[in-house]
Amino acid sequence: MKGNREVINQLNQVLYHHLCAINQYFLHSRMND
């Protein structure tokens, strides 16, 4: 189970960074309108 927890933490970090990137993308596209 300890290994699984590590994998879940890694996936959470990846998801978090993807969400931040998407938010930045939308923010910039709205600012350019």
Curated annotation (Swiss-Prot):
What GO molecular function terms would the record report? ferric iron binding
Keyword set includes DNA repair = no
Ferritin-like diiron domain location is: 1-33
- Keywords attached to this entry: Iron, Iron storage, Metal-binding
The Gene Ontology biological process annotation of the record reads: intracellular iron ion homeostasis; iron ion transport
Q: How does it assemble?
A: Oligomer consisting of two types of subunits: light chain and heavy chain.
This molecule's function is given as: May perform analogous functions in iron detoxification and storage to that of animal ferritins. Contains approximately 750 iron atoms per molecule.
State the similarity comment: Belongs to the bacterioferritin family.
User: What is the name of the protein in this document?
Assistant: Bacterioferritin light chain
What organism is this sequence from? Answer: Absidia spinosa
What lineage, starting at the top, does this entry show?
Answer: Eukaryota, Fungi, Fungi incertae sedis, Mucoromycota, Mucoromycotina
